[in-house]
């Protein structure tokens, strides 16, 4: 990703070019390199590095955000995300060790802040071996969950691929732990089948589910109808179609108050929140979008907080009240637009996708 432009954007200098330029501008020595490209697959569409976290000595700043102008609102718009600051030496060490022990395998991982970067085809076999090794062996090395009191703990988790994925398994287990209420944040409404079935079971059992998702105009791929259309601009409508079908299917639970669906929208700002809250007992911090791509293709991580004595309850409630601030609760699935109400170029593309069965493929990889 560091070697390409934004999806749908004009070709221009990439992040990797900028890293190289900065090294020259400041006349830095050739060693050590500071920026590395981690290839999770030989093609970006089939997997990228999506793990999160910044480590400063013994402090971990965990966020789904990137460090750039829009997330940090350096100009007019902002992209809304979560930021958690955790001071713990053991946790910080485990995250740094993970990078050194597993990510920085120099057979496949190369510096980006140099002019001569290897082409994918030159390291294709190394990339395949690298992904296989990460999927089979990579994990955060801790003897036990990191303790903050006699019971409050945090466990770092990693996952890659459809089988043997620890993070996926923990997320599925969290859904099974719900006694009263599950809260989910995701920017892209596109749950994998296993989570859809678990949500259905929770509702059938009389449990409460709250889903906080971005309105289509709060999606980072959204293009206003008055602007020239690009293919990536159809994605927010595809996600809204998913949401409409889901809400129609579970309309009775929306009506009886067991299912709450909130749409986040604040002007032309965008929404990028992910996370899971279970019964004031568990909080999952993650960059995982809870979609098929995260489930099968990308390298993902997360921090699972277990808080059986509700020591973090006031902080968790405060964060959720902030998240809900710019949301509207759906009363009926018909409040969401349907295909015939979409701009003509979007209608044409989504109809074409459906006709050639490409919509299912798109949902698997985006």
Where are these regions (language model features)?
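Catalytic-core regions built around general acid/base machinery
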Residues: 1, 170-177, 194-209
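HKD-type phospholipase D/PLD-like phosphodiesterase module
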Residues: 1-178, 217-279, 295
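Generic beta-strand/beta-sheet core signal
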Residues: 56, 63, 185-187, 212-214, ...
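Acidic-and-aromatic substrate-binding clefts and catalytic sites of carbohydrate-active enzymes
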Residues: 76, 188-194
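Short, catalytically relevant binding-site loops at active-site mouths
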Residues: 189-191, 216-219, 291
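A post-motif C-terminal structural segment
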Residues: 199-200, 236-241, 286
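Long, C-terminal catalytic modules of enzymes
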Residues: 252-366
